[in-house]
């Protein structure tokens, strides 16, 4: 029985019925239209290699705090994550300190990545915001890191001796400036208000997971990270509460 089947069976036993879902029987992947606080407790212990997610931090502090019960969720994440697993979680700048304070109670902060999307927001009464914060948490000291894939592209080829001469890549830092943001004319753009570029998900999976890993996105949105997992040959479990975004993700990943 694969992980999707185990979740489905547990949901039926607990609630007496199944949530709307799309399932790929070949890979064992599934996308559930459900509240993650209902579904996370149904996932088996130490069964997930990576949690890659983007919680809805743009809905206002009070509502966000209710929607995203940080402490309870990180307890579940710690339980379901394999010993060498990683969590990659986006956090809006106005919430990031609160997120870290709660995450640190259950997981270990391994790095703090800044995605510079170049295109800014705001600017009327404060500086233009071009950054997005991506927190990398681990469960132990045995995380996955594929050094041979940890590189970023640069605009001008390097000059130097030997292998450094003429390179168009460099070692990956924790400030990412080489990934194009989603803009109104982007081909992959859809109706989700905080959609992330597919390339971000693919980079995270390339560098910090192995092919065939089980990837969880419990705030799946329009399915960006699920598509990235599918593209990289991973099994994915997606959970999305909002029907309109669930439908977008179904069309994107299973269409």
Regions found by a protein language model. Give the residues of each.
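Core catalytic lobe of class I
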Residues: 1-11, 20-248
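PRPP-dependent phosphoribosyltransferase catalytic core
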Residues: 247-255
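Short, compositionally biased
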Residues: 15-16
């Amino acid at each position: 029985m694969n992980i999707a089947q185990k979740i489905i069976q547990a949901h039926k036993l607990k609630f007496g019925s199944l949530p709307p879902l799309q399932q790929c029987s070949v890979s064992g992947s599934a996308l559930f239209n459900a509240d993650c606080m209902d579904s996370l407790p149904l996932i088996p212990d130490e069964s997930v290699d990576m949690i890659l997610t983007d919680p809805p931090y743009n809905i206002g502090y009070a509502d966000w705090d209710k929607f995203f019960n940080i402490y309870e969720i990180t307890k579940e994440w710690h339980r379901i994550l394999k010993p060498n697993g990683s969590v990659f979680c986006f956090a809006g700048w106005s919430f990031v300190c609160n997120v870290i304070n709660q995450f640190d109670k259950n997981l270990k902060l391994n790095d703090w990545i800044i995605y510079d999307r170049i295109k800014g927001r705001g600017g009327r009464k404060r500086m233009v915001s071009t950054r997005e914060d991506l927190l990398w948490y681990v469960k132990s000291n045995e995380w996955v890191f594929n050094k041979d894939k940890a590189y970023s592209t640069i605009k001008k080829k390097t000059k130097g001796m030997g292998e450094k001469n003429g390179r168009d890549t460099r070692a990956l830092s924790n400030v990412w400036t080489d990934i194009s943001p989603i803009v109104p004319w982007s081909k992959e753009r859809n109706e989700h208000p905080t959609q992330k570029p597919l390339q971000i998900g693919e980079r995270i999976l390339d560098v910090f997971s192995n092919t065939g890993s089980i990837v969880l996105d419990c705030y799946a949105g329009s399915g960006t990270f699920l598509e990235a997992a599918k593209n990289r040959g991973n099994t994915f479990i997606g959970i999305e509460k909002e029907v309109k975004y669930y439908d977008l993700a179904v069309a994107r990943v299973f269409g």
